Amino acid sequence: MKFRFPVVIIDEDFRSENISGSGIRALAEAIEKEGAEVLGLTSYGDLTSFAQQSSRAACFILSIDDDELLPYVEGSDGEAPEHAPAIVALRAFMEAVRKRNADIPIFLYGETRTSRHLPNDILRELHGFIHMFEDTPEFVARHVIREAKVYLDALSPPFFKELVKYADEGSYSWHCPGHSGGVAFLKNPLGQMFHQFFGENMLRADVCNAVEELGQLLDHTGPVAASERNAARIFSADHVFFVTNGTSTSNKIVWHATVAPGDIVLVDRNCHKSILHAITMTGAIPVFLTPTRNNFGIIGPIPRDEFKPENIRKKIEANPFAREALAKNPNLKPRILTITQSTYDGVIYNVEMIKDLLGDMLDTLHFDEAWLPHAEFHEFYQDMHAIGAGRPRTKALVFATHSTHKLLAGISQASQIVVQDSEDSAFDRHRFNEAYLMHTSTSPQYAIIASCDVAAAMMEAPGGPALVEESIAEALDFRRAMRKVDAEYGDDWFFQVWGPDELAEEGIGSREDWMLRPNDHWHGFGALAENFNMLDPIKATIVTPGLDVDGEFGDTGIPAAIVTKYLAEHGIIVEKTGLYSFFIMFTIGITKGRWNSMVTELQQFKDDYDNNQPLWRVLPEFVSQHPMYERVGLRDLCQQIHSVYRANDIARLTTEMYLSSMEPAMKPSDAFAKLAHREIDRVPVDELEGRVTSILLTPYPPGIPLLIPGERFNKTIVNYLKFAREFNERFPGFHTDIHGLVGETINGRIEYFVDCVRD
């Protein structure tokens, strides 16, 4: 396949009718005759800005004219001084390009100047000089194209390179999938639409494991294995395993390779539901470490003291099933510790502190870094992620599971398992692969494998660190813009962005700015340990008026669910919505245009709210689905929902239900077995208190399981479910979604139930 990477020529005389313009156009024509595309530009002043687009070029040819340097060279020792405008601009361009791309060829084109006239720091970045009156344009064109081809050929990582080659070769397919490279779609009108939408390349590259030259994902051979080794090098790990069905599966693989029935496991209560599924599947006995929460509903860190071995032992002894296991085997150690790193809202831990606290208490540490795969690539996150360059080994084997599709450039479900060997023993890949095989399809999607490969290779220095720094910079610029807008409104209301009170005025500042210090009011988590936690600045929680971090409601308020519906109807989709906050991420794909659009839409919402615009005008799609709101004003609806939240003190209730005591009545695997054997009762919400759930109960937001199979319903949780029932009935379209809650229509009214273990 021929990729589109033009040769970029930047010369102010490119379109001029003089000898310099004639010479550079002759070179451009010669390059085009060799089959390459040329992009000619005349603006020298925009070089630095254009350098940011170096990812689109095969090489650069930059003009240096005699009349730009001659006034500075005459009377000197022959070298142009540092302050010559041409040198200043050229250096700025070089620095901007090399910050992102160390390898793209750069040529200088001129009349008589040579390397004697340029500083060494510029010379060392060049691939050569092109002199206008020496070699023929045809010869120079071939030389330029050769260098560009060498550069482009080296870009592709192992698996992606072979997949492109295979798709290019046009081999007839006699294996699955049945569409045979997309041909089946061409035989049907609907198939034609599908083919035109996704394109030839995706369908030709959709192959199965019969294509031996691509290697095997299940056995980690060939180009697949080479790509996994390349990713391990880039992520400073000993091993990497690509996973094509998400980090939910990566987590289950780690657990099935480590945990057996009856093992005691230490788990972050804020863990993803896939960890709780793994507990159920493996028959483990979970002992939970409890994170903090603030009144915005933002999940905070587990206090540092909870990681102390003596406190962990107290938790183990307080769990009846763990206590029973210890009675049978007093030497039983917890099998694994799984920590959510980072939380959904961006709170991360100093991992080295955790490792030091635990000592040799565990043999396996697992950090669910679904939301933190970028941390290895910027010093901002030093010690704040599981595995990194120069990090000491511990007595424990360390796993990190990454969603490369969440923060990096992977496509959906692209994930990877990253491993660091313990200091005492090497990791047994063959044993681990037995668990890998249990959870991996024998028909993996090769586009996802290629995505894992490319996403890792894109993070190679210097490009990867530059992408992460750019994300941090854009996130801080967004925060500054929001504060500027708020300041200009004076005493009037506007949205806030949750974070430290002080921001660096320019640049990305210091990571110390983002540390969660003990009792800082802004975070609302109380007396945290010093230097133990940090807020990842690329995660931004936007707070709406109506509730403060102390849990106090204002007289008026704007529930976040209304704001995010408004944004969605204006083409802006957020990641997560809470009661009075919503969450956005500054991934490596975020642009200035995107976050500036967010700022302007929030200002537009303010105007529409202040003017109490009717919902039929500002939320027409929503009103078409829920006509009961047609004549309601935007401000009126906000106040109606706010009044209900306030009357029920819902912020405090949702915080307390997660912090309330959860009584384990059965092992999760035993409770789920009751579900499988149909030994359950479908219990109405009003009768749930004291019953034992057989399922995961997960409210959205925040999407964190509230109860797991085998735990008993308490009064606080039942009160929340009663509130959700009444709220959903009163405000259709703004319903609280709770996974595990079964809705059934009885006598024209929706009633809610939960499947519980039969008494």
Give the residues covered by each predicted segment.
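Non-catalytic terminal extensions of PLP-dependent enzymes
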Residues: 2-5, 20, 24-33, 42-60, ...
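Short hydrophobic beta-strand segments
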Residues: 4-19, 61, 265-268
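Short loop/turn segments at strand-loop or loop-helix junctions that form parts
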Residues: 11-13, 60-68, 289-292, 542-545
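Short beta-alpha junction loops
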Residues: 13-16, 66, 108-116, 135-136, ...
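Conserved PLP-enzyme active-site core in the AAT-like
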Residues: 41-45, 50-53, 63-67, 81-82, ...
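Conserved N-terminal alpha-helix of the aminotransferase class I/II PLP-enzyme fold
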Residues: 201-249, 754
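Short active-site oxyanion
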Residues: 238-240, 262-265
